[in-house]
A protein has these predicted regions:
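Ala/Thr-enriched low-complexity intrinsically disordered regions
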Residues: 14, 25-27, 37
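Short hydrophobic targeting helices and cationic amphipathic motifs
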Residues: 10, 16-22
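Accessory carbohydrate-recognition regions in carbohydrate-active enzymes
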Residues: 46-456, 462-517, 521-533
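Bacterial N-terminal signal peptides that target proteins for export
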Residues: 21-32
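Glycine-biased, low-complexity coil/linker segments
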Residues: 1-3, 31, 35
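Hydrophobic h-region of N-terminal signal peptides that target proteins for export
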Residues: 36-44
Length: 533
């Protein structure tokens, strides 16, 4: 017999004695059972693509990925947040340009953020932070933050141990819900939701304790790359806990006043903790807490539903995606779904390290663009943010200057249905705003980077045979961006480009040569699509 899962050769002697028939039959049955067992073990012993993914790849050296669990193209990810506070210098978010909620070299953790970006170059999102602690209640993240150990990250799963509290944390996620398990020791325990802390440069939030098992609220985000502060927008959430809190409350740090008013205000500039407060609290530095007293080690599960439309939709997302499933069921389904997508490409040969690099890279291509619409199909309209509804998936995070060269070509070849929905999402953006996207984020146009890349993606998609979208509309949108001289957000300096054939340093300060090249490529894409129509 060969090794586990190997070929098994059997040679049975011919029947010589009838009285040994039953004995020989039972022996044959045992052998066949052993064969089936060996091949079953062999099948399980074979690694699947998810087993080769290392989510820590890209979390160092400004790779700006994070190791938190996320579903395929998920709206939600549960990332450890370790970029706040002087203990994380020099890689601290307020001390330098830093566009990620997690850096592998850092050691001081202040929570787990539920809305994050992966692989981008500008600080944004990194909000709705939850943090389990033990002992007395402390709401200052510089004081309740802690080092951590026993860090594990796999596809759909993250865990660590918070050293100061001896609390183990596990996390997984569905498309729109982050699910965490907190393993508390005996004694006093707290679960904090901090809406003042985040990676985003925007401020402003509201929070309300609905019951001893639920908190709801909204956090303002926006100003990606410090552009367009007028286009800040809300992220809504509902957090639900598996055990009712013994005590609950909120905190708020007000503005520091000076003069006579400060003399009368006993809490001037100080954080106010308000036990039992169940009204809505609005402010910049605010949060809520759930407090417990455990007579024995206890596990509390927390689910955080997210929506860009409303608190009601965040609650519905939570209920539809997680209410009937356990943590382990959600994790197993996430791994199964990831494996289905990663298995679209099978790799032979090479070393184990090569497969780790390949499948980790493929994994990262399936994070963004990500899902914008809620479970019921609702999503916010560009500019006005009124509620619209889609029957397909409405995608967001179109970092097209970064992705038009190769990511979308890969999507067309390997995941054509996703790519089709991405093109349809771009055309929805055109319908809503009047322009194709340039660098769209959660129904806002950041206009970051140069060029006019959406048309390149659309033309390439069509020429690769994916044609279940309104190509006439797409072509008209592409021509508009190439022809409209005035008030054109996609092609600044277009008049000079059309007259001279290139941009000058007097026309743009964003790189005249590179921008000219981008316009050239876009025009070529329009020409190729026109030829095919």
């Amino acid at each position: 017999m060969g090794g586990v899962g190997g070929c098994v050769n059997l040679r049975l002697k011919p029947n010589q004695h009838r009285h040994n028939y039953q004995k020989r039959t039972m022996t044959l049955q045992r052998i066949l059972l052993l064969i089936l067992t060996v091949f079953t073990l062999g099948a399980y012993a074979q690694k699947q693509p998810v087993d080769f993914v290392n989510p820590f790849i890209g979390t160092s050296n400004f790779g700006t990925t994070n190791p938190g669990p996320i579903a395929v193209r998920g709206m939600v990810s549960v990332s450890p947040f370790n970029v706040a506070g002087p203990k994380n210098l020099p890689l601290e978010k307020d001390s330098r340009w830093l566009s990620t909620p997690y850096v592998q070299e850092n050691t001081f953790l202040t929570g787990f953020s539920h809305v994050n970006l992966s692989g981008v170059g500008c600080p944004e999102l990194g909000v709705i932070l939850a943090m389990p602690t033990a002992g007395d209640l402390e709401v200052d993240y510089l004081k309740y933050g802690t080092s951590y150990s026993d860090e594990v990250s796999k596809v759909g799963y993250y865990s660590n141990t918070l050293d100061d509290y001896n609390i183990k944390v596990e996390a997984t996620a569905t498309t729109r819900v982050g699910v965490s398990k907190y393993f508390f020791p005996k004694g006093d325990a707290n679960i904090l939701i901090n809406l003042g802390l985040g990676l985003t440069n925007e401020q402003g939030a509201s929070i309300r304790v609905v019951s001893p098992t639920e908190v709801e609220g909204v956090r303002s985000v926006g100003s990606f790359c410090y552009y367009k502060p007028e286009e800040a927008y809300p992220v809504y959430f509902v957090a639900r806990f598996s055990r009712p809190a013994d005590e609950f409350g909120v905190w708020k740090k007000p503005t520091t006043h000076k003069g006579a008013e400060a003399e009368w205000m006993g809490y001037n500039g100080k954080t106010r903790v308000m036990p039992g407060y169940a009204m809505e609290v609005v402010g910049d530095s605010i949060g809520s807490y759930m407090r417990y007293n455990f007579k024995e080690p206890t596990v509390v599960e927390m689910k955080v539903g997210i929506s860009y439309v409303s608190i009601e939709n965040a609650r519905e997302n939570l209920e539809k995606e997680t209410s009937t499933r356990s943590f382990d069921q959600i994790l197993e389904e996430s791994k199964k779904n990831w494996n289905q997508y990663l298995s679209k490409i099978e790799v032979e040969g090479g070393a184990k390290e090569d497969k780790i690099k390949f499948y980790s890279a493929l994994y990262h291509t399936l994070i963004h663009p990500s899902t914008l619409n809620d479970y019921n199909g609702d999503y916010p309209k560009m500019k006005t943010r009124e509620t619209l509804r889609t029957q397909d998936t409405r995608y967001t995070v179109f970092s097209l200057w970064d992705t038009y060269r190769n990511l979308h070509q890969l999507m067309s070849l390997v995941y054509p249905r996703q790519q089709s929905n991405m093109v349809k999402s771009m055309l929805q953006i055109y319908d809503e705003s009047g322009w194709l996207p340039k660098w769209e984020l959660n129904a806002t146009e950041t206009t970051t980077m140069v060029g006019d890349p959406a048309g390149i993606v659309i033309a390439d998609t069509y020429l690769k045979g994916i044609r279940d979208f309104d190509v006439e509309k797409a072509y008209a949108a592409m021509v508009k961006s190439a022809d409209q001289i005035q008030d054109n957000p996609l092609r600044p300096g277009l008049m000079d480009y059309l007259e001279k054939g290139y941009l000058t340093t007097k026309t743009t300060n964003s790189g005249s040569v590179s921008t000219t090249q981008e316009y050239n490529i876009s025009d070529y894409a329009i020409a190729q699509l026109a030829r095919a129509l």
